[in-house]
Amino acid sequence: MSELSIYSEQGGEPVFSTLDSARIQHELSLRGIAFDRCASKAEIALDADQADILSTYAEEIHRIQALGDYPTVDAIRMKPDHPDRQALRQKFLSEHTHAEDEVRLFVEGRGLFCLHIKSEVLQVTCETNDWISVPAGTRHWFDMGEKPYFCAIRFFNNPNGWVANFTNDPIAERFSKLRD
């Protein structure tokens, strides 16, 4: 289930938490973050490749592309046995920004986006059928968990794909990670 928890940037207990997707959408929109749910699709086959995944979600991809300038789309799929899972997790766990929006449609599993906005940290657990759009320049990090299980369609306006500018702020170390 999707979840939003809002913390002071100092850490500690959340000052707000909800599992209600309408409240999640509202609270995020107040902070310039787009969040929505897409219609459910059939489960993705274990042997599905990127082309199969993108074809299955073509309608949603076109709808999201129409919301912004996202000509490049790909799919990333992580499973607990992925050989590079620990290295990739560590890379995404460091606070960073992008020169472009970070837009993700989760089509399988879940992941945790942590958004550092002003004096707050918002932890958004995204589940299957959630999409989130984090505006360019937003300080954030992402946790896929120790045993990652997710597939997300990624939307880019930069043909080079995922390009991070790391802040070197250790803030992510003060906050909880995705619970497996």
Swiss-Prot record:
Sites where the protein binds Ni(2+): H96, H98, E102, H140
Provide one Gene Ontology biological process annotation.
L-methionine salvage from S-adenosylmethionine
Q: What pathway or pathways are given for this protein in its record?
A: Amino-acid biosynthesis; L-methionine biosynthesis via salvage pathway; L-methionine from S-methyl-5-thio-alpha-D-ribose 1-phosphate: step 5/6
* Reactions mediated catalytically: 1,2-dihydroxy-5-(methylsulfanyl)pent-1-en-3-one + O2 = 3-(methylsulfanyl)propanoate + CO + formate + 2 H(+); 1,2-dihydroxy-5-(methylsulfanyl)pent-1-en-3-one + O2 = 4-methylsulfanyl-2-oxobutanoate + formate + 2 H(+)
Residues annotated as site: May play a role in transmitting local conformational changes: D101
Q: Which InterPro entries match?
A: ARD (IPR004313), ARD_bac (IPR023956), RmlC-like_jellyroll (IPR014710), RmlC_Cupin_sf (IPR011051)
Parts of the chain that traverse the membrane? none
Q: Which family does it belong to?
A: Belongs to the acireductone dioxygenase (ARD) family.
Task: Tell me the PANTHER family matching this sequence.
Answer: ACIREDUCTONE DIOXYGENASE
Assembly and interactions? Answer: Monomer.
- Its recorded name reads Acireductone dioxygenase
The protein's organism comes out as Synechococcus sp. (strain WH7803)
